Amino acid sequence: MIKLFHINKIFQQGARSINALSDISLHVPQGQIYGVIGSSGAGKSTLIRCVNMLERPTSGQVLVNGQDLTILSDSDLTRARRRIGMIFQHFNLLSSRTVFGNIALPLELDNIPKAEIKKRVDELLELVGLTDKHDAYPANLSGGQKQRVAIARALANSPKVLLCDEATSALDPATTRSILELLKDINRRLGLTILLITHEMDVVKRICDQVAVISGGQLIEQDIVSEVFSHPKTPIAQAFIQSTLHLDIPEDYVQKMQSHPAPNLSPLLKLEFTGQSVDAPLISMAVRRFNIDMNILSSQIDYAGGVKFGVMLAELHGENGGVESTIKFLQDHHVKVEVLGYV
């Protein structure tokens, strides 16, 4: 549905050339939700704007719905863009128009008959859950409601693809969840292909089928979400995943923790579980097998792409090599073990 081949984008700043995107290739299958994640300045927005040619790549091919947009004439590109919807972090609604008027605008520009416009807008209002806001103005809407209007407007011409440029960044967590659920519902109901960019791994975790990680204008990792969460291949991907699961060491432990082992101290471990290691009773197995005691201080488990992953802070007590054997046992069963200190 969306195929990018060797996309490069160079911006000229005086005599200086800035490589915003370097040799990026990716494929978004039809009907999937594909996330692109990266830090600020990584090139995410430039990439998504290349998909509908708001930014023209310096080189490379952009195929959407089987068409190479980079070789289309201006008139053909305008027609192709009607099948590509887009929403932004800022809603860009017309304050002088009602909700109905904002959604109807793309249809009016296409000279669609009024009766058809009314029918289509009513369908979209029901789809996004705003049937009671037909005559409301943007000033009287919440942030989440404004984004729902923007989504409805983006769907007015029945696009095959929806591009989401940091669409939830300006929203509070509860509203973000509701907008993500709406996008997932639209994807399921309409078979819509969605490409979204974000700097939040929680967004990817909640709705994406596949994810690509971008850094410094380069695509450094891409795979199905469950694989990236289970086996991240780059430090940047690992950092994004850890941002979704973060456990703080209790203050009293921070104050008494030592950096080196001693006869009267026990190791404080951070254990990271992914995939099968989450479901296996590894802790109870280790306690029985190596005759150790484990004091679990805190833990958290979450899901992404149908795969569970989790993190745990635990204090480990044992004798006669039990601690070392336990750590090796856990590592052999694909648990990442980090000794944070000794308490």
From Swiss-Prot:
It catalyses: L-methionine(out) + ATP + H2O = L-methionine(in) + ADP + phosphate + H(+); D-methionine(out) + ATP + H2O = D-methionine(in) + ADP + phosphate + H(+). It is found in: Cell inner membrane. Keywords: Amino-acid transport, ATP-binding, Cell inner membrane, Cell membrane, Membrane, Nucleotide-binding, Translocase, Transport. ATP binds at residues 38-45. Gene3D superfamilies: 3.30.70.260, P-loop containing nucleotide triphosphate hydrolases. GO terms for molecular function: ABC-type D-methionine transporter activity; ATP binding; ATP hydrolysis activity. GO terms for cellular component: Gram-negative-bacterium-type cell wall; plasma membrane. PROSITE patterns: ABC_TRANSPORTER_1, ABC_TRANSPORTER_2, METN. The keyword ATP-binding applies. Residues 2-241 form the ABC transporter domain. Pfam families: ABC_tran, NIL. It is a peripheral membrane protein. The keyword Lyase does not apply. InterPro entries: AAA+_ATPase (IPR003593), ABC_MetN_proteobac (IPR012692), ABC_transporter-like_ATP-bd (IPR003439), ABC_transporter-like_CS (IPR017871), ACT-like_dom_sf (IPR045865), MetN_ABC (IPR041701), MetN_ABC_transporter-like (IPR050086), NIL_domain (IPR018449). Its EC number is 7.4.2.11. SUPFAM superfamilies: ACT-like, P-loop containing nucleoside triphosphate hydrolases. It comes from the Bacteria. It is an enzyme of class 7 (translocase). PANTHER family: AMINO ACID IMPORT ATP-BINDING PROTEIN, METHIONINE IMPORT ATP-BINDING PROTEIN METN. NCBIfam families: ABC_MetN. Part of the ABC transporter complex MetNIQ involved in methionine import. Responsible for energy coupling to the transport system. The complex is composed of two ATP-binding proteins (MetN), two transmembrane proteins (MetI) and a solute-binding protein (MetQ). Belongs to the ABC transporter superfamily. Methionine importer (TC 3.A.1.24) family. This is Methionine import ATP-binding protein MetN.
